[in-house]
Amino acid sequence: IHAAQGYARASSRLGVVIVTSGPGATNVITGIADAMIDSTPLLVICGQVGTAALGTDAFQETDLIGMAVPISKWTMQIRRPEDVAPAVAKAVYIAMTGRPGPVVLDFTKDAQIGSAPFIYSKCSFIRSYLPVPETDPESVAKAVELIDESSRPLVVCGQGVILSGAEKELMEFVRKGGIPVA
């Protein structure tokens, strides 16, 4: 998982990780959390037991979805082969848009060994997903006021500036304000 993170960060492309169920699933948890914290786009694909065996403590059954929900942008367990293409399209869209981050797809054995016609269409909109949050004008006005009142303002920024493509805006802001940046 850490190699996929390195690839994603160095290339600005999606890193992909494929692991087995059980120990494979548990071993990616730290990497998923790290990718979430660092805004690294990852697609984590994990194997899982058959649908009929879910919840029975079957050999190497691990609730990756339950573990990954709080540390990823989106998770889905895929139980039917016909759900594979739409789930992958949605996962890639979510991982790469807005603040990038990890998404997790948990493929049951049924989804892995079944077959369905391959119909893939790129996802470009999800009704309940807002990749770019709305700006609150009151918060912006308050920030301007705080900066104006500050005797020695300093801008400390990270890779979010690069991820959002705001390098020019940042440089214009600090030049106009005469504010040092780190």
Write out the residue ranges for each language-model feature.
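N-terminal alpha/beta PP-like core and its mobile active-site loop of ThDP/TPP-dependent enzymes
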Residues: I1-A182
